[in-house]
Amino acid sequence: MNVSELTPLPDQKVAFTLASVKLLPSVAGCYVLTNFSDEILYVGLTVNLFQRFKQHRETPEKCQPTTLGRAQWFYFVTADETEINAIERGWQNQFSAIHGALPVLNKIDAPVR
């Protein structure tokens, strides 16, 4: 599934590189890791996009190649903390409705929020 098929659509994008961390705000939001072709590899939520991005960059499993390729892009939308659970669940449900499972990297445990 391509990130462009999600509703609501993430409205910002940075490369999934350490150099990009400085471009992220320290606010709540939902995000999607995609490969170079924008195929979804991971869907998540956080109360701090800046910190969460750094955590994912420090998680070897999130940086290794998957069956769909390596994470290249970090798409995100900022949202109030009261809205992020619904946005993330909606994105996961949209993905699962097409593929019958969560994205490949959502199967890897990571620190909460």
Put a short name on every predicted segment.
Residues A97-P111:
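Coupling/hinge elements of helicase-like and P-loop NTPase modules
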Residues M1-V47, Q51, Q55, A79-Q92, ...:
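GIY-YIG nuclease catalytic motif and its immediate N-terminal context
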Residues R70-T82:
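Nucleic-acid nuclease catalytic cores
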Residues E5-L6, F74, I108:
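Short, exposed beta-strand/loop patches in secreted or surface proteins that constitute
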Residues R52-Q72:
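A broadly used, surface-exposed interaction patch
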